[in-house]
Amino acid sequence: MLRKNPYSWWLGVPLACAALVACAGTVLQPAEVKATGLTREQAQEVLLVALKHQDYQLNKPGVFVDGDLQDDSGQPPHPGYFDFSLGYNDPKAGATEYWGLFSVSTATGDVWEINSCKRLDGSELRALQGQIMARTGKTLADEEPQRQGLGCEDQP
């Protein structure tokens, strides 16, 4: 007859907790935002906050955010922004479906889906953006010249 080792349970608990923390991802700490603005990793965290309240199934297996979008010089295509694509690798179809292309302002955390020129919004995102702007000293009005580079009109 098999017997369970009581000590294996105690080993399993810390391992399960470590796995849960690793899977949960990081949460942007506004105090870590520098006056120069968001890093690529921080901008991706802002995007994830914005996407939580959209109609995307982010927990679906195969969903990904690609944050390595660069021009031929290795720079982000839109100055003052980091660009990310959101997509889904469908294992049954053997295909990748892209759901959107998003730009996140390094100075304010402003988030746009640039294919549809839709500014993402939500109370949690606005609160985070307020904290980012407090750290950078920038406002949405300050970044209007960079925002024009997205090719999208400001929304009322």
Where do the language-model regions lie?
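Bacterial N-terminal signal peptides that target proteins for export
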Residues: 2-13
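C-terminal partner/receptor-binding element of secreted or periplasmic proteins
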Residues: 116-156
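Short, non-transmembrane alpha-helical segments in secretory-pathway proteins
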Residues: 28-72, 135, 139-142
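Cystatin/cathelin-like cysteine-protease inhibitor module
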Residues: 56, 61, 99-102, 106-133
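Exposed beta-strand-loop-beta-strand "reactive/processing" segments of non-cytosolic proteins
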Residues: 59-107
